[in-house]
Amino acid sequence: MTMPTLSALQHRLAQLAEQKNEPLTLAIIEQLKQQSYQGALSAPLVQQFCQQFSLSKIELGLGCVPIAACYALTPVSHFCVGAVAIGLSGSFYFGANQEFAGIAMQQTVHAEQSAISHAWLAGEGAISDMVVNCTPCGHCRQFMNELNTATTLQIHLPHRQHNTLQQYLIDAFGPKDLNIANVLFDQQHIVLPLQGDALVQATIKEAQQAYAPYSQAVSAVALQVGEQIICGRYAENAAFNPSLLPLQSALNYRRFLGLSDVAVSRVVMVEKRAVLSHYHMSKALAETALGLTLEYIAV
């Protein structure tokens, strides 16, 4: 099983452009082409599109959601969900659901997780708004409750805008109930000893930014993608099951960097020894999604 190809993405975008046949969609798709299909819009581009089409940021985000959905990988559901995480910086980060055939359903990345992980890996400091084409499921509501902006986060749907996450997750259980002050998107203070070659060292450095306050099982994955190194990191959750594993994070980021057609030659995982491990799940996904053996280092 492989990740969706760039040609498949281009085909979906062409179909969407034909169906919509309106200036905003065409302009955004053209911009994506110019940036080699990296699924994000910088703050200056967001401002430019808002001015050009006389739209608010939220209206522009709603216009981007069907485009974000074109990045979905859905061999199981055949149902594409698109999301746009709006950073405090003003940048837009696209997300889409990522499913993996031939492996457990629990390996799935939800669209909101996809957009949030995309923003986190891109260096965004916080998320102010989440725009999505479908009502967030309970899994995603709980995942978003881990954010450092959970109390102010605004959720926007095509049929309903400007509702807080708290309106979707009443009497929520979250990190504060477990006395966690330094939450997702806050700076983490983890020190791990460096070792190994450049790919291993990149993985270790990424693991130092992982978020695992409940198990302490910080981990990261690095992919050798052509000449580039793409990393993903573990994002734990107070409810445990909505946690996002590092290989899913890395594969998702690869997709939104427009590199899904570039072969992965190595996959390395670094994990701190703790009460639990995600090695076996990650090993299975590496073999199924990439046809590669996971190189694993416990520190």
From Swiss-Prot:
Coiled coil: none
Record's function text: This enzyme scavenges exogenous and endogenous cytidine and 2'-deoxycytidine for UMP synthesis.
InterPro entries for this protein: APOBEC/CMP_deaminase_Zn-bd, CMP_dCMP_dom, Cyd/dCyd_deaminase_Zn-bd, Cyt/Deoxycyt_deaminase, Cytidine_deaminase-like, Cytidine_deaminase_bacteria
Superkingdom of the source species: Bacteria
Keyword terms: Hydrolase, Metal-binding, Zinc
Co-factor: note: Binds 1 zinc ion.
Co-factor(s): Zn(2+)
Protein name: Cytidine deaminase
